[in-house]
Each structure stands twice: as C-alpha cells, then as structure tokens.
C-alpha cells in the first residue's frame, strides 16, 4: 500500500493526466503508477550464489485518439514530466493513425473506485535475508549428503514480489492494488553411469506471503528427490517411435494446458495482432461454439478470482474486474481471453479482463489468466483417482514435472518432456525411465483423455515466466488441474 502522502501525490498526478487527456479530445485514456519490489535468492551447493532485492517505479500513459493508440512512460513522477508524457502519447496516437487500417474500438466498462490487496499472513519482505539464506543452504546441505551415492549438484531458490499499482481512467475509475507473490524450490543432479540426470521439487508460484514457504514440506521432500535423481541416472531410456498410454500429474499437465489451451485462446493471437513466440492460433473465431477441442468430459475454466492464483488480482490494467468463465465447455470451444479491444472486434458486450502489462513502461496486452482443468465429478464415468488410473493401465508411462517443450506456429502440434518418468505394467509402477518425450496434435491429445482426477487431487501448479510480445513481457498464471490419463500418444521418435 502507498503511504497517505504518496497516495495523495499520485492521485493528484492521475487527476492531472486524466484532465489533460479529456481536454485533448481523446475517446479514452488511462494512467498506471506502478512500484515493483523483487527479491530473489539462489543457492548453489554450499554457498549463496545470487541475491537481488530491488525496487523500480514509474508511470505509463495510454490514449486512444480517433481510433489510434498512443503510449508514453517515464520514471520521473513530477507534474512537468507527466504533462510531457501525456502530450507525447497524444502525438504518437496521431502518428499511429497514418498507417492504421481500422480504427480501434473498445467495449464499455463501468467506473470503479476500489482497493485490492492480496490476502497474506506474513509479509515476505519482513523475513530477514539471513533466515532465507539459511533455509536454502540447509536444503542444499541435505541434498549433498547423498554425494557419495552420486548427487553432485544442488540448487535452491526463493522468489518474492510486491506490486503496487494505482490506475485511473477517463471512464472515471480510480483503483489501487497491492499484489504479493511467493515461490520456492530446489533441484539436484546425479552424475553416474556416464550420464547426468536431475530431479526437482517446488512450492508452486502463488499469490501468498511467506506462509507459502513451508519449511517442513520443503525439507521433507529432500530424501525422495535425491533418491529419484539417483534412480533416474541409472534408469533405461524411455521408448521411442511407439504409441503409449500416458498418466500425467498436474505438475506436468499444467504446462501442456498453458501452451495448448492458454495461448491458442488469446484473442489477439487468434486475430494475428500477436505472433511472436510460437505464432498465432488454429482456434479461429469461425470455429467458436463448434470446435471439438477436447473430449466431452473436459472443461477448461478461467478464474482470476481464484484464491492464491498467480494471476489473481482485483482488476486488470484496463480497470475491468476479475471474473471467471469457460473457454472450453464439455469439450467445445466456447470463448476466448479478451481485453476491451479484442472483445469489441468479437462482438462481445464486455471484456474478460485479460489486459496486463508487466511494467509501468509496457503496454497492456492480452495475457492468460488462471486457466485450469476442472476435476471430474464424483461418480462420473470418466473420473478416477491417480491410483485407480495406474491400477487400470496395462502398459503406460507416468510423468511428473516439466522438461523441454516445443509447439508449432499455430499451436497445433506440440512436444513435451518431463522431470520424472515411471513405467507402468499390469497396473503397477515397475521402475523409472529417463529421456521421455511425448508429442501430439492439440485437439487429438485432449480428445484422447479418457480419465480425469477428482477434486481431492486438484493442485495449483503454474508458471511465473510466461513470455510474450516484442519487446518481451513476462506474466504469471496458475493452471490448477488434476491428473489425467491419455490414450494412444506418440512417444519419442
């Protein structure tokens, strides 16, 4: 939260900006004052290898003049600089009109005067650096107790973020938000048998305070992670050039959801406004309401109100309140991820609130919200626990964690790896594998899911490093999901 004096100064600047934008005859305008604090600690083996704790702040002004966008930003938060940036944004909008084919139009949004703060129990920045460093070194020391068996490297990390944002618009909104985010994990590498293999564990990135850094949980997983790294380095390589049944844990499935459902349903990517980082999308608007994206028992739901979700906020960067909606309902593509501009082009009456900028100096763009796979209903014909899926599989592979991945320029064809792999035979896990990859066409993959986990196995996995745009912007989101079983998937090759 801003101090009272700082908030008043910022509100005065925001009022000045909005008045200037209105006086210039713009159809719309907004301003964001943002302050970001980021703290990261990394430990490598027996030493703290990386420590940053920095803060940056500034403001960005966006105007829509005669159907064209203009944007300007600065770190100097003074009346003189603000006036200069508003005028610059207006001049840029005038220049943009010279090469613009179609004018920008926006769906309406109500005016909001509100405050949102991430509910936390412990401010992560109140914990001494020494305590955090000692936790990481303790983790590494315990991992390296397996050095004689073959563990050669240990790495651990902690990441904390605080974002303060004040948003004002010509619609009449004045919204102040404070977002907290926490993340931790570790990795060890076994070297033996002429090979090197790693295993990882993380407390997933979530919008929580230091209470998310559960030391008991982190320390209790060390023995398992080290032993699995050692087993993995001696394990046989996975099969290649065959089809197999896959059982995917949420720790692996979330990235598949991210790449094959999240990005293809970003409406700016569908329209071709955005084509960096794996291109546009096959899920075009002429297929809305008809495309059999997944099996009829599959539902993908967006929810920016999800407690602790990595993209959970009160409002997006256009002042649109957070909400929830389906993008795939009973297997059918039913909606997209939109901001006010793309929603208007689609013919919708309102935005889904997906506009986000990663900095005061960045333009908002459509970003994936919390997007998850709904659990199977109790008693559903395709609902099964992870244990039941394994017991019901004659031959297959169980995958945990994420590895390498790639996807084509329309998000049709993908390949994913993982971090841990186990061979299943006659309903039992018979040992680890290594170097397994699976690949499929997006709609084939999701239509071949024949079992999904119940709500009791729902996990909030996700990413804090989703890149999009040029210049690059980074966003974060949760892909809460359950285990699934998928039939006849290509392995390796």
Residue ranges of model-derived segments:
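Active-site bordering "gate/hinge" segments
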Residues: 1-324, 329-332, 426-428, 442, ...
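Dual-mode signal for accessory low-complexity, basic/Gly-rich regions
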Residues: 239, 275-493
